[in-house]
Design a protein with these regions (language model features):
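Generic structural signal for well-ordered alpha-helical scaffold segments
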Residues: 2-6, 68-73, 184-198, 228, ...
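Short glycine-rich anion-binding loops that position phosphate/pyrophosphate groups of nucleotides
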Residues: 20-23, 88-90, 212
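Glycine-rich phosphate-binding/hydrolytic loop that grips phosphoryl groups
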Residues: 58-71, 213-269
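Glycine-rich phosphate-binding loop of actin/hexokinase-like ATP-binding domains
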Residues: 77-136
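A mobile "lid/hinge" subdomain adjacent to the ATP/sugar-phosphate binding pocket shared
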Residues: 133-207
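Short secondary-structure boundary segments
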Residues: 87, 139-140, 210-211
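Glycine-rich phosphate-binding loop and adjoining helix at the ATP-binding site
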Residues: 3-15, 21-81, 218-229, 233
Length: 269
């Protein structure tokens, strides 16, 4: 990786990792992986970084680092209360409250927005709950969503395993009624999740991220309309905006994290 980026090893000052699981960033350890990279919980990454590179190491949850990046240098720059929802294989979230990243007692606050339950009788999620946002509307569950949908044609269901959101949105744009139904139902679920985040965290702005935002011209107006109609916001509408840093958001978040660590500044609440 260093060679690919043409970085001299001698110039290396710190190693950072954005990890898709619950992370203790104080002790640089993975707490829980939800059946992904389970061996990570037993690895001393601090030790690995020092033994191999003789540099300090830092890490955090990938979605939390993404919101940190967008807050520091991206779509939420200048704001103090921010929620970011990243739509992809799963549903990731990160939260900034009063100018600090939200962690909670056990470092999981703000990170589990994909596992907020919207339908307690709904589809079983990988976390063990029923009807989580992720189980109802993520890319990982999309083939299952298609196969189990009672209103879709059998011809559409036959290709369930090859569907991703890019294809669903393209087919919907071309007028395919089955794809349009799935697309709109998923956007309704994302809107419902955002309404819940707004009620829980009272943000100034909500950021949407993930590769699916290549269709932001469809997603942002649709979700904004639903949220404006249904969210309880006496102080006014909460803007929903696309992320602007793309896949680099978490890298900017890591940079923010490293800078604050070197300055011995507190970054969390």
């Amino acid at each position: 990786m260093l060679a690919a980026w043409r970085i001299d090893v001698a110039a290396l000052r710190c190693i950072g990792l954005a990890f898709p699981g619950l992370v203790d960033p104080i002790h640089n350890r993975v707490i829980s992986t939800n059946e992904k990279y389970d061996d990570a919980c037993s690895i001393s990454l601090d030790k690995w970084a020092w033994e191999n590179w003789e540099v300090p190491f830092c890490m955090d949850n990938d979605a939390r680092l993404a919101v940190a990046g967008e807050w520091w240098q991206g779509a939420a720059r200048g704001k103090n209360n921010v929620v970011m929802m990243t739509i992809g294989t799963g549903i990731g979230t990160g939260v900034v409250i009063d100018g600090r990243l939200l962690y909670g007692q056990h470092f999981q606050a703000g990170s589990l927005g994909g596992h907020f339950v919207l339908d307690y009788k709904g589809r079983r999620c990988s976390c063990g709950n029923n009807g989580c946002v992720e189980a109802l509307s993520s890319s990982f569950f999309l083939p299952t969503i298609v196969r189990e949908h009672a209103l879709l044609s059998e011809s559409f269901k036959r290709d369930a395993d090859v569907y991703d959101f890019k294809r669903i949105f393209r087919l919907a744009q071309e007028g395919d009624e089955d794809a349009l139904l799935i697309r709109n139902e998923c956007m309704d679920i994302w809107a419902s999740a955002i309404i819940t985040y707004i009620h829980a965290y009272d943000p100034e702005v909500v950021i949407l991220g993930g590769g699916i935002l290549k269709s932001q011209e469809v997603i942002i107006p649709y979700i904004s309309k639903r949220v404006d109609e249904l969210a309880w916001c006496p102080s006014g509408k909460v803007p929903i905006v696309p992320a602007i840093l793309g896949d680099d958001a978490a890298l900017f978040g890591l940079e923010y994290f490293m800078v604050k660590q070197q300055q011995n500044e507190r970054i969390c609440i």
